[in-house]
């Protein structure tokens, strides 16, 4: 959520910056609502003051032995008017809040202006794509040939966009998650967390999935002791970031760096017909998530560091990649600045996203009321939140199968993963 004061005082600037994201803010309507809010606020305060003043005169009139029926009637009339104005004011505030909750974050000035992914800007590459002297297979053919990827059984059990993994490929998938967690906790300073895969509405509102992106989620029917429905997490960003919702942490505790390896669930409502084969776009997938909670002045440096942590995974695995900065029209709803890391996939002969690292600044923190106590004045201030994939496990598995394939259909295991595979050097 944007700063309400900035929104009121810099409405034209806000509209201009949001327009670079493709979000058209109805300035005239919002201005009208703000004027109505001010008018109702003044009217409410005046009615309240009048009623209070007249109410005090009742006791004085009684002490003088005067009839107070007329005064009582006047107080009752003012009370009815006050209640009516409060209802009007609440309706206006609710509409203003709904508009505010629908607004995406303001893009950072360093984010390139553009309409879509074609205007993202590549900032660096690492590694050289391998040259093959045999016909390249994609991960589907490789995985099925090794009896490790079973799409048919997944369709029978559940439906499309799910997978059953078996044997050494299932083991390799597990090894990847463990390797990523170990790297981030032992070398990058993150604390591992085990979090729920089901979250409540308040959590999804806090990180910005609701109210706008409800159709992208899987929802349960009310089934808890509290009688509320829950939603499967689309990313561990949701539970990890919400750990500080409605909290004030000490400045000395910052930065807070958290990581979790979880299953993630997405309906892919807007992706009909895209990546219908294989592991690239699944309803259920594993991901190691990185979250940082920092002071505002540290968040841009933290974004660079977090992106580097995700890149290190690919470097240790020897997987070529490129990093791009997203233009304003391609950024996620809550992001102020985002780097996408794209890994090289020989089976598709292109780079594909494997991590998205974002600085949300105070956008999520304001929705969650996640704050820290500033030592200098002992007052609470909003945190800045950051998140990124470190990495998407399934897509990393795809990259390993395709980049490390051999002519006979076997797959060489990257050296960094061999300790997690019992010393195994090859699958198949």
Swiss-Prot record:
It is found in: Cytoplasm. Keywords: Aminoacyl-tRNA synthetase, ATP-binding, Cytoplasm, Ligase, Nucleotide-binding, Protein biosynthesis. InterPro entries: aa-tRNA-synt_IIb (IPR002314), aa-tRNA-synth_II (IPR006195), aa-tRNA-synth_II/BPL/LPL (IPR045864), Ser-tRNA-ligase_type_1 (IPR002317), Ser-tRNA-synth_1_N (IPR015866), SerRS_1_N_sf (IPR042103), SerRS_core (IPR033729), tRNA-bd_arm (IPR010978). The keyword Protein biosynthesis applies. Its EC number is 6.1.1.11. It is an enzyme of class 6 (ligase). One of its GO terms (cellular component) is cytoplasm. CDD domains: SerRS_core (cd00770). It holds the Pfam family Seryl_tRNA_N. One of its GO terms (biological process) is seryl-tRNA aminoacylation. ATP binds at residues 266-268, 353-356. Pathway: Aminoacyl-tRNA biosynthesis; selenocysteinyl-tRNA(Sec) biosynthesis; L-seryl-tRNA(Sec) from L-serine and tRNA(Sec): step 1/1. GO terms for molecular function: ATP binding; serine-tRNA ligase activity. Its main location: cytoplasm. Catalyzes the attachment of serine to tRNA(Ser). Is also able to aminoacylate tRNA(Sec) with serine, to form the misacylated tRNA L-seryl-tRNA(Sec), which will be further converted into selenocysteinyl-tRNA(Sec). PANTHER family: SERINE--TRNA LIGASE, SERYL-TRNA SYNTHETASE. Consists of two distinct domains, a catalytic core and a N-terminal extension that is involved in tRNA binding. This is Serine--tRNA ligase. It comes from Shewanella sp. (strain ANA-3). The gene is serS.
